[in-house]
A protein has these predicted regions:
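Short beta-strands and strand-loop turn motifs
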Residues: 96-102
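Beta-strand-loop-alpha "switch" segments that mediate conformational coupling across diverse proteins
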Residues: 133
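A glycine-rich phosphate/pyrophosphate-binding beta-strand-loop-alpha-helix module
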Residues: 109-113
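Short, solvent-exposed loop/turn segments at secondary-structure junctions
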Residues: 104-108
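Nucleic-acid nuclease catalytic cores
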Residues: 136-138
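N-terminal beta-strand/alpha-helix entry module and adjacent surface
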Residues: 1-91, 114-130, 141-151
C-alpha cells in the first residue's frame, strides 16, 4: 500500500496580494489585460511555448489567484479538467477563467481548443463552478469562446 504525504497533493496557486475587487475580469478585454499584466510577468512564462493558466474568480468576478495548468510546445498544450478545477475547488472559487497563448501570434482556436473548452464547461457544470470563458491570446488579438457564443 502506498502512503501519500500531505505535500503529495499540494496545489500551487499564486494568490493575489491585491485588494479583492480592485480588478474585475468579466470580459475578453479585461481577461487579455490580466494575461498581459500578470501572467507574462511570471518568472515561468515562456512566449515561445503554449502556456495555459486557470484564473480563479470570486462572486464579483475579481481574480483571487491563478495557477499554471499546462505547458506545451510551440503549437500544442495538453490540459485536463481536473487540473483546472483542482485549484478552483481548493480556493473555493465561484468561477474559473482559462487563458492560453498561441506562440504563432494567431488567436484562432484549433479543434483541440474547441474540444477542451467543451470538456471544461461540462466539468464546471457538474461541480457547479462556472467556466466564465476560455481565451486564446495571440500577438495583437484574442479569441473568446464566450463572445463567439460557444459558452
Amino acid at each position: 500500500m502506498t502512503r501519500y504525504g500531505k505535500s503529495t497533493f499540494e496545489v500551487r496557486v499564486q494568490r493575489l496580494n491585491e485588494t479583492p475587487g480592485s480588478m474585475k475580469v468579466d470580459d475578453a478585454s479585461s481577461a487579455a489585460t490580466y494575461w498581459r499584466e500578470k501572467i507574462t510577468a511570471m518568472p515561468w512564462y515562456d512566449p515561445e511555448r503554449e502556456m495555459c493558466v486557470a484564473v480563479m474568480l470570486n462572486t464579483r468576478l475579481s481574480p483571487v489567484g491563478h495557477t499554471l495548468v499546462g505547458i506545451g510546445t510551440l503549437n500544442e498544450c495538453t490540459v485536463h479538467p481536473r487540473d483546472v478545477f483542482r485549484a478552483a475547488v481548493a480556493m473555493a472559487a465561484y468561477a474559473v477563467l482559462v487563458i492560453h497563448n498561441h506562440p504563432s501570434g494567431e488567436s484562432l482556436p484549433s479543434e483541440a481548443d474547441r474540444r477542451i473548452t467543451q470538456r471544461l464547461a461540462e466539468a464546471g457544470r457538474i461541480i457547479q463552478i462556472n467556466l466564465l470563458d476560455h481565451l486564446i491570446v495571440g500577438t495583437n488579438t484574442c479569441f473568446s469562446f464566450r463572445e463567439a457564443g460557444v459558452l
